[in-house]
Design a protein with these regions (language model features):
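Short, acidic/polar
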Residues: 112-124, 144-145, 174-179
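N-terminal metal-binding scaffold of metallo-dependent hydrolase/deaminase domains
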Residues: 1-56
Length: 195
């Protein structure tokens, strides 16, 4: 059985109007239309109006979620996914936090299996809180960029931190290593890679 052409979610929803305002449609409906790239929002409005317009069309699935409020996905414009487990550690000052927590934790990402598992876990966390895109930093290890771009669902630009100075010996890169990493990842990912 093929997927319906239209899926209509009957629910409340938040509709952003600008960067400072949104409207809350309490008894609304959002119409998703099937495309070659999956379902995309096709129309939205008051539930009564939408149902009157689409109910007679062929290939419609109505999904009633009266106690649900849908909202758009979130975009986080700057985060270091490889610092997730230390982000809540005490931060009296940045340098102590980096030395005591962040750098030792990021060093663990040299292990590809560790990096892959953490990327899968963090991808689940992103979806659970509704984050569907953003600008992300990985560790100095190129595979941490690979893992983020493989597992994160949505529109992400990922870059790795470049640590050629003022870092612990176990995380320092030579300028040559950093340039090699940039060339490899930018060639592989194009616009999805950030420097």
């Amino acid at each position: 059985m093929s997927s319906p052409l239209y899926k209509i979610f009957c629910c409340s929803y938040l509709n952003p109007l600008s960067d400072t305002r949104c409207e809350w449609i309490r008894v609304g409906a959002i119409v998703f239309k099937r495309t070659a790239k999956g379902y995309r929002i096709h129309a939205h409005g008051p539930q009564k109006d939408i149902l009157n317009q689409y109910i007679r069309k062929r290939s419609v699935e109505i999904i009633s979620k009266p106690n649900l409020t849908l909202c758009p996905g979130f975009f986080d414009t700057h985060f270091h996914w490889v610092q997730d487990e230390v982000r809540l550690m005490p931060k009296e000052n940045l340098l102590d936090w980096l030395q005591d927590y962040t750098w030792p934790y990021e060093a663990k990402f040299i292990d590809k299996k560790f990096s892959q598992k953490k990327a899968k876990d963090f991808a689940k966390e992103l979806l659970q809180v509704g984050t569907l895109g953003g600008a992300v930093y990985a560790s100095i290890h190129t595979h941490s960029v690979d893992h983020a771009l493989k597992y994160f669902v949505g529109d992400y630009v990922v870059g790795n931190v470049l640590m050629t100075m003022n870092s612990p010996e176990y995380l320092i890169q030579s300028e040559r290593e950093a340039l090699k990493s940039i060339e490899k990842l930018s060639s592989k990912y194009g616009e999805r890679y950030a420097m």
